[in-house]
């Protein structure tokens, strides 16, 4: 039994009693990385020397018994800036970018005394659903190395599933935490928009992006979200909402819980094996005293189209800062300022990023703004209202995290429309800004299936309660890939 088979709470107790040291945990991480990283490719940059340095300091100072995360190893998605540790967003244009400040979540993790093992692979600028658009390498799913881990936080999910780190941070713009968590058989939470500061997150679509935790179990996830949540003066979209002790909500009691199951989430396009796993999960929740009804989110069908117009439009604006002048890659072949801009961006961005920048610029252009961008915003309002309507009568909404299990590497990379349609069950949640968690709920042909539990605004505690009650009745979260 490896050290990472223990939960956060169990490891904390061992650290406080000095049965193990932070140095032991960091060693466990790097030994595992040495053993499996060549197969999975979770990381872009390792932080080995600094990690062992912090571990020794914490070992000498002693673990704070009131600090649940002290001395525990974490991996951080490579679009979250880390002072003096290369941060690339998996793009050539930021290949050698060395940030001069920490993201707010990184500062909070340092205050919590976690130990950063390294920066995790992702789709370039978080644009993708498979971690295949990374400039550096493709990440492989630990359950089947011929398949994708999901995306864009594929490295964050694969590192946890492969036991390279205890937990990780990802970001979720249209499903980028929940879908890889589902594909890799781990737990991933997308918090309410504004719950976690985005300061220091390299922006893709600012009205949709949200940072969240990926862990092996629900309790660990709750501890990590507690540590990174809260108002931040550096992020005007962060919301002044009290940071609850999410871990206190894990009572196992969900008697009387009212679940809405959208007919749109179990219809055509959802794999039979995925659908069956979700229906079985609903039976488990019924046994625990919950009830469920079929409901409708009628505007879900417009989710993917609206999302790709809005997200791409915001990306075309956000990514205009990468111009070869201030930081990042600069084309050596330019002789004029105009050439510097065009060549730097043509050479520095990958195909998918360029595709979305062009799509967004087109949607925002004169003559098309009303037809595309404005229409997408109107559809977003309707999608948001769908959720508001259902939550008037139901406590949570439940469905699959993804319509399929993990697909083959290179299986969809040249078919962007099919790839985009994979996000059909996750993008409405980002458009509405509500929280959702993916928890393992079974297997289909040996591949993990994720159950998506969606809550009303700032009801993460309820999501954790439901997810934890389900987890306690099942063993799916204890299953591990054979690497």
UniProtKB/Swiss-Prot annotation:
Record Pfam families: Amidase
Gene3D superfamilies in the cross-refs: Amidase signature (AS) domain (3.90.1300.10)
Active site: 77, 152, 176
GO biological process, one term: translation
Catalytic reaction annotation: L-glutamyl-tRNA(Gln) + L-glutamine + ATP + H2O = L-glutaminyl-tRNA(Gln) + L-glutamate + ADP + phosphate + H(+)
SUPFAM superfamilies: Amidase signature (AS) enzymes
Recorded GO MF terms: ATP binding; glutaminyl-tRNA synthase (glutamine-hydrolyzing) activity
Ribonucleoprotein recorded as keyword: no
Catalytic EC class: ligase
EC number: 6.3.5.7
UniProt KW keywords: ATP-binding, Ligase, Nucleotide-binding, Protein biosynthesis
GO cellular component: glutamyl-tRNA(Gln) amidotransferase complex
Role noted for this protein: Allows the formation of correctly charged Gln-tRNA(Gln) through the transamidation of misacylated Glu-tRNA(Gln) in organisms which lack glutaminyl-tRNA synthetase. The reaction takes place in the presence of glutamine and ATP through an activated gamma-phospho-Glu-tRNA(Gln).
Complex and partners: Heterotrimer of A, B and C subunits.
Similarity comment text for this entry: Belongs to the amidase family. GatA subfamily.
Protein name: Glutamyl-tRNA(Gln) amidotransferase subunit A
Organism taxonomic ancestry: Bacteria, Bacillati, Bacillota, Bacilli, Bacillales
Record gene name: gatA
